[in-house]
């Protein structure tokens, strides 16, 4: 679980990266689709899954908007992300293993875009936070 120190580190990092959330989301989602091509199946209704395509940009923005909600609900991720969990489980039917894949891509993008802010402590805290988000999103699958 997230310690107070982790929560503070996530909030501090988010305050620095939040303005670039759309670019982070686009790059992370584009990266996921290229590096893990099996994830393309969730986006087969799009005309293209080429990195940077407007649909990828729009969904990357949605993903990062969801993470912004998670940061604001950091003290109770399960309750804060309940609606998103329901949507991903029942409407979108996303395999929860893909949350971990996207989390990894988000970490990679943040580390390359914000190397000075992505300290080892920020990395640990953000990784724990993203793992908590993945668990909260997977809660409706049980």
From Swiss-Prot:
Keywords: Acetylation, Heme, Iron, Metal-binding, Oxygen transport, Transport. InterPro entries: Globin, Globin-like_sf, Globin/Proto, Hemoglobin_a-typ, Hemoglobin_oxygen_transport, Hemoglobin_pi. Heme b binds at residue 88. It comes from the Eukaryota. One of its GO terms (cellular component) is hemoglobin complex. GO terms for molecular function: haptoglobin binding; heme binding; iron ion binding; organic acid binding; oxygen binding; oxygen carrier activity; peroxidase activity. One of its GO terms (biological process) is hydrogen peroxide catabolic process. Red blood cells. Residues 1-142 form the Globin domain. O2 binds at residue 59. The modification N-acetylserine is found at residue 1. Belongs to the globin family. This fish has two hemoglobins: Hb1 and Hb2. Involved in oxygen transport from gills to the various peripheral tissues. Hb1 is a heterotetramer of two alpha-2 chains and two beta chains. This is Hemoglobin subunit alpha-1. It comes from Notothenia neglecta (Yellowbelly rockcod).
């Amino acid at each position: 679980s997230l310690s107070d120190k982790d929560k503070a580190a996530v909030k501090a990092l988010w305050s620095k990266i939040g303005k670039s959330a759309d670019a982070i989301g686009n790059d992370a989602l584009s990266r996921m689709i290229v590096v893990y091509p099996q994830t393309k199946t969730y986006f087969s209704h799009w005309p293209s899954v080429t990195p940077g395509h407007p649909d990828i940009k729009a969904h990357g923005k949605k993903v990062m908007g969801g993470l912004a909600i998670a940061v604001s609900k950091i003290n109770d991720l399960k309750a804060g992300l309940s609606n998103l969990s329901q949507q991903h489980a029942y409407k979108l039917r996303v395999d929860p293993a893909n949350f971990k894949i996207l989390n990894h891509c988000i970490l990679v993008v943040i580390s390359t875009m914000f190397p000075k802010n992505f300290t080892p402590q920020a990395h640990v805290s953000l990784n724990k936070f993203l793992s908590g988000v993945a668990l909260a999103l997977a809660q409706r699958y049980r």
